[in-house]
């Protein structure tokens, strides 16, 4: 069995408790208090009990604390996947979207995401999903534009004949025209 990983020398239990009081991150405070118990000479099993974790996790906290100090005990955000397009490829994509497709060359009259997926593969040999292309376009400042939907059998010449020409006529109701009936209990009742 290996020996325990030692904590760094530039902190002590009191300093870690002070940092735990000042932090606004509850997880960091719990980890600092667990490490303070180790600094005070307590066994690592007590630190695991204080942190409500296993000994392996306490060891991971010690390694993170030794490497980056108290900031190493804050949960970091996962970096996520690497972008498929580099800056030059993004600029080429923006340029081709702004200039629009050439029907004789690209075979389309307007860019759709699936057409851009095909263009990116032909130009850069990078396979992308349509949603990823949409995310890239949004990051470049482009927005999806769509025409107002129309019925396929709509006759544009007869649209004016069906438009409402007069404004609605509003009249005031007579006073007391809708007097609600009440029951013996005071609530409204239905008409028979």
From Swiss-Prot:
Domain of life of the source: Bacteria
Entry's family note: To A.xylinum IS1268 ORFA.
Keyword Membrane: no
Residue ranges with Polar residues bias: 182-192
Pfam families per UniProt: HTH_29 (PF13551), HTH_33 (PF13592)
Keywords: Plasmid, Transposable element
SUPFAM superfamilies from the UniProt entry: Homeodomain-like (SSF46689)
Name the record gives this protein: Uncharacterized protein y4pG/y4sC
Protein source organism: Sinorhizobium fredii (strain NBRC 101917 / NGR234)
InterPro entries: Homeodomain-like_sf, Winged_HTH_dom
Region (Disordered): 168-192
Membrane-spanning intervals of the chain: none
């Amino acid at each position: 069995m290996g020996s325990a990983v030692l904590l760094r020398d530039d902190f002590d239990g009191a300093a870690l408790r002070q940092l735990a009081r000042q932090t606004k991150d509850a997880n960091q405070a719990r980890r600092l208090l667990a490490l303070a118990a180790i600094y005070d000479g307590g066994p690592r099993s007590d630190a695991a009990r204080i942190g409500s974790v296993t000994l392996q996790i306490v060891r991971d906290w010690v390694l993170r604390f030794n490497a980056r100090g108290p900031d190493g005990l804050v949960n970091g955000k996962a970096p996520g996947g690497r972008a498929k397009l580099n800056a030059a490829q993004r600029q080429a994509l923006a340029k081709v979207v702004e200039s629009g497709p050439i029907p004789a060359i690209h075979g389309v009259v307007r860019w759709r995401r699936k057409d851009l997926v095909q263009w990116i593969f032909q130009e850069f040999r990078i396979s992308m999903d349509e949603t990823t292309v949409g995310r890239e376009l949004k990051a470049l400042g482009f927005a999806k534009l769509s025409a107002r939907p129309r019925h396929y059998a709509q006759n544009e010449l007869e649209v004016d004949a069906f438009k409402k020409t007069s404004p609605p006529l509003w009249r005031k109701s007579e006073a007391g025209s809708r007097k609600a009936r009440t029951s013996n209990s005071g609530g409204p009742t239905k008409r028979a």
